[in-house]
Amino acid sequence: MTTAINNNIVNKEFDLKDKTFLASGKTKTIYQLNKEDQYVLIESNSAITAGDGAKKDILPNKDIYSTTTTVNNFKVLQLSGINTHFVKQVEPNAFIAKKCSMIPLEVIVRRLATGSYLKRNTHVTEGTKFNPPLIEFTFKDDVQHDPLVTEQDILEMNLKIGGVPITSKLLSQTRHIATLSFEALERAWQSLDVTLVDFKVEFGITSQGELILADVIDNDSWRIWPKGDKTLMKDKQVYRNLPSALNTPGATPTTQSGPLLNTLSDQQLKMIEDNYAWVATSTEKLVEFTAANLNNNNNNNNNNSNNNNNNTSSTSRSNSLPNVPSITTTPTLHHHHHHHQQQQSGVGNNNNVNSGFQVQLNQPLVGIIMGSQSDWETMKLAANTLTTLGVPFETRIVSAHRTPDRLFEYAKTAKSRGLKIVIAGAGGAAHLPGMVAALTPLPVFGVPVQSKALSGVDSLLSIVQMPAGIPVGTVAIGAAGATNAALLSAAVLAPYYPSIELSLDLYRKKQTDAVAEIPVDNPTSTSTTTTTTTTSNATSILSAIHTSTINSNTSSHNNNQQQQQQQQTILPTQPTIINTPTPVRSSVSRSQSPLPSGNGSSIISQEKTPLSTFVLSTCRPSALVLPPGSTIGILGGGQLARMMAIAAAQLGYKTHIFCPENDPSASHVATYTTKSNYNNYSALDIFARQVDVVTYEFENIMVEPVEYLTKQVAVFPDPKILRTCQDRVLEKTFIQSLDIPTAQFQSVESFNDLKSAIEKIGYPAILKSNTMGYDGKGQVKLTDQVDLEQAWKKVTSETCATKAILEQYIEFESEASVIVARALDGTELTFPLVTNKHRNHILRQTIAPAQLPEYIHKQANEIGLKIARSNGLVGIIAVELFVVKNNETGQYSLMVNELAPRPHNSGHWTIEGCVTSQFEQLIRCVCGLPLGSVDFTKRISEAEFIQQQIPPIVMTNLLGQEVNGWEKILQTKGSHLHIYAKGDAKEGRKMGHVTQQ
């Protein structure tokens, strides 16, 4: 339950003298306010300690610096929509907070690997980035020095705090809120070019049974590195790193039966004090940065500002915020101690985050209307974008010519129903936007829908030519216009709704990052066909989609018939979606706009976030795992997805295939299958709600849909790796940046570029399409006898690419590959190096292990691990290599040819040849499980295999009609046959494989 804290509470004068001592810790004391027993006074002291209090100093003014830092951090979180216990600052070194029963856990959020994490994970390099941030729990127990605990450890304690049991769901909520809090502060610190490395927070339970962020967040709670430089750190770690007290010149330590006191010299004290003062001052700027957009429109809202629910403490700078009725504050009760464990939790020196106000996005703010059913194909892109940004909306067909009464009613009541903006899409005569603008005072954005006759130019001219005094903000024709109308709407709302502002900033940053990496070559239109089936008899369970209602928690006092009709989402018919008789998720009720329940949820209250279905490992304290029984989504339905699904089933996971093909190979073994184009965002929304993690079977999938999924569900490997591997120029540039050799290359964007490039590279050379090439498609070997213009046309036409890459032709001894697995916790392994033989550019045979010198095996492993670490891989990646022999020395060396961030054809032999196959290893990686052994099934290492001269394992692809020899293959001793059930056995098509041991 969320309760507003109004100005009466914020402006209330508390009797600070009438108080009762509750508890004290190393750095603060907590008092019960007797006349306001639902509140406490938290008073900081000037002590600074390290080593669980083993050494202690008194730092001048630390009490003021700590309180200032804490209060400012709470304000940042309030502005970001995160609930905390903070009410107001009442003294330079004290603030009022809501009373709550403290959960005896610290939640640690790590962006970079450093400190104690490195001591426990020696294989991880300092500075390794965790994305998403890594979450750890410690149990508050001074005797045991706050040990690291797993979720299972916590659940076995059977904790019940404030009458609320500590369940797996509640722990998931703490992870989610802690992550949001970290990201809000991280974003604010970035504005000052400071890296927030990690922090720790605590939670409490209010008297209303509500989970809330509590305690303090000061300079003892985090690591911050200005300019990302550890040597410039300003946090408490500087104090921890100072030499032992007895060896400190100028210090006068006291060691009598307790902590080591007065360990610092005057010079050291001054340095630490300066750091704490700098941090306290800097956090003022964090508040300014976070509140900037909220304050931009302050002058336009002075008439409303007296009613603001502003829960920030009083300072010399007034943060007057626009009056938005849906902004409320949630009270958080603090430090109500019932027993020993809770008392300990309330007095620790670790700090918690608080925020006072949260935007309640519980009714539509934007109305999306269109003239007809056919306009939905365009207008749903506006709906998709609003979904991404967390903006609640409604959608309705309102024809200016065929339903004028409906139009009049809709426009006239739009403002009274709480809408702030209307997006109107229409084609042809396109009168809808203008007529709505004439009837409502709300801003109207007009989207010209592309018409068959004049390609939308008629629509554009009809909308844009409005007379003076009746404005319609007109955007581009078609898809771009629909998307931009949604973005403009979000930009208008952002100053009043912090969660929308944050989402919009993240969206813009992602757009910038994408453009900086690589432009999109081949955008395709959204599909209109989606079908979900299973291997059992399928039945429809989503018929409610066609007439669902907005989950709008508006007041029921005026719910007359007209309001009820307007709350109903009357939408164009969605794609047909059939699902399995076994319910996939209970949350399938949703608006036909691809927004859950037609409603943008607040940034705290979302039930599902990308890692919300992961839990802490029961045996590895730092690890997140997805438990068996969960569903793994796989983009693609070919043989790789098929073998992934089989491996997943072996470990107890369900799989859900998403692909556009009819009767895909993987559908025969997967639990669920969705038939849809990859850029059907409505289908992707449903898919994301039905799975717990997503991976993909091939790298030539469109990146944008994969990136879209990351907002709703964890996707591994990261789509950024996908972008790199799809673009050969970007891929080779990345590899060379790691000082790993590749063939010389030149980017080619035109025939003239090709002529210039061949002069630099020389003959012979290989011309390849820059994207989408596979199994020899889109490439030509160039000699001085080849017509360059014809080669250019062939390469670009075969793959519909607009760019190419010209590579130096490498005279290699053989081709090889190494597959690297890297888990969610950063552990990593390489499969044995193999050599590959091709026929007509298609892999024919793989020999494992490669019959090459041991130093080449070592070099391949080093290359693979370097690539995996550098791109933050979670999953598996195959590194295709050229083995080059120096004819003078007889020495071999390796050059990287290509990367594939998925299971690889050259790894199929691992199904029978290794203890853990590449497919099982992928499942382990994306689900956070421990990596499996990559030893041969003979239980010997790669080096032992080579030394004992055991005959290699051979995997042979069955191409085309070769699969018809399946019976003969089965008669061969030591053969393991895999048939992919792919239909027509076309020439060169991979129909199966056989592994011989």
UniProtKB/Swiss-Prot annotation:
Low complexity bias (residue ranges): 294-323, 342-355, 524-536, 575-597
Annotated stretches, region: AIR carboxylase: 305-997
Role, per record: Bifunctional enzyme involved in de novo IMP synthesis, an essential step for de nove purine synthesis.
Protein name as annotated: Bifunctional purine synthesis protein purC/E
Name of the encoding gene: purC/E
Residues annotated to bind Mg(2+): E880, E898
Protein source organism: Dictyostelium discoideum
Molecular function, one GO term: metal ion binding
Pathway assigned in UniProt: Purine metabolism; IMP biosynthesis via de novo pathway; 5-amino-1-(5-phospho-D-ribosyl)imidazole-4-carboxylate from 5-amino-1-(5-phospho-D-ribosyl)imidazole (carboxylase route): step 1/1; Purine metabolism; IMP biosynthesis via de novo pathway; 5-amino-1-(5-phospho-D-ribosyl)imidazole-4-carboxamide from 5-amino-1-(5-phospho-D-ribosyl)imidazole-4-carboxylate: step 1/2
